[in-house]
Amino acid sequence: MNNKIVRSWPLLLSALLAASCGGGGSSAIAPTLESITLSPSILRLAPGASEQLTVTATHSDGSTAVLPPSSETFSSSNVNVASVSASGVVTVAANAAIGNTATISATDTASGVTTASAGSAQLTVTTAGAVPTATSVSAAKATVANNAQCGADIMPYYWEIGDQNGPLVSGSQGADSTGAPVLVTTKLAVASASKLLYATYVTQLRGSAAALTSQDTNFLHFTSGYSNMGDSSGPVCPQTLDPDDVNSCLQLRNPQGVLFSAQDPATVGRFYYDSGHMENHASQFTPLGTVIVGSLGKTIAALLSPKISIAFGEPLISGGAFLSSQDYATVLQRILDGTLAMRNALGINPVCTHGANCNAAFSPIPEPWHYSIGHWVEDDPLTNGDGAFSSPGAFGFYPWIDASKTFYGILARAQSPENGEQHGYASAQCGRLIRHAFMTGVEQTQPIPTN
């Protein structure tokens, strides 16, 4: 084709577009506000305690953004239990009875859009007693020893609960076919627990949770539309890549022949649990795209803590990390003490993943948890969800931080991923029981948390 024609084509196209638009302005329709949600979605506060709410908007084009509290009107279903200020701070009444509840909602002043029930915050008044209680450790250990959810089906495993200063209680259950137990120093493939590590890396790279861009948010809570990699726990980016890095992996194709780097318009704005979101984000918005696999873990670890060691078996950002429970716990401790900016990103910009009124495309977790920045929010009321933040992996590695951002926990194991993400979910079913036993000081004897 004639070069002059090729070079003049953009100018001709611009002229035609200008003519069709009347010579000025734009015919693009601005996205409209479709829904707003509050986070944390579950509040467990003692009488007199307060908590700041965050308002997240979802627009018609699938994009999300944090809204300033000044643009919203907040309300409480029971002001005798809890009030909410104009700036979105919830405060429990000093004389509120333990067990009382209230629903906190918000209305966008400009559009009139109001939080649906799933987007509102559910508050329960709890005791102000210190945790751990005198029986927290014994209750956690008894739950591990006696509850079927923590039994032989998920052994061997290591478990731990701690705070920002280190472990408070831990143990190792069972052994593998060689007689070896899982220890705090055992290096494991953590699969999708890599997602929380990457989200923590990105938030630290930006400098704060508030500095996360709308693009960061859409990629990290899996609504970007980059859903063509799948979430296989087997090798996705083979070692035959040259160079062996994220960018090269994205040039591969899925079984349907679609590039990993391709966006699917059908999933833009919809939650779709897929490795493609983080892989493409790392390539487009961070320096990790050209980092070879042998240096990938070191590069991420350097921003998280000088004390930890992370390795990657393949350049799969969302699922390829190997590390010990000891090193993963260090990251969780630094989140809790605020050294890592991820503390303020926990639970923000949550999207729904299940339900009749949820426009999600795919979730591997059978409960309607919400998904935030590289982690789940365990807020299903049918299983007495406590709002903990977690990132279970397909092999069974389950890290969590409780809703109050005071304690962390790990249940570490590595089993073959024949059931997709279900080893991670099985670990979560045990891990949440241990957490609840520790938080309440009461042994958990049922399949879901009670008491």
Protein language model features and the residues they cover:
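Structured C-terminal helix/loop/strand segments within mature extracytoplasmic catalytic/sensor domains
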Residues: A128-S138, G385-N451
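A short, well-structured edge-of-sheet supersecondary motif
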Residues: A140-L183, Y398-D402, T406-A412
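Extracytoplasmic soluble-region selector
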Residues: G22-G129
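Active-site-proximal loop and beta-strand segments within enzyme catalytic domains
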Residues: A152-M155, D176-Y273, T290
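Mid-domain, small-residue-enriched loop/turn segments at the edges of structured enzyme/sensor domains
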Residues: G234-L332
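C-terminal motif of bacterial Sec signal peptides marking the signal peptidase cleavage site
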Residues: A18-S20
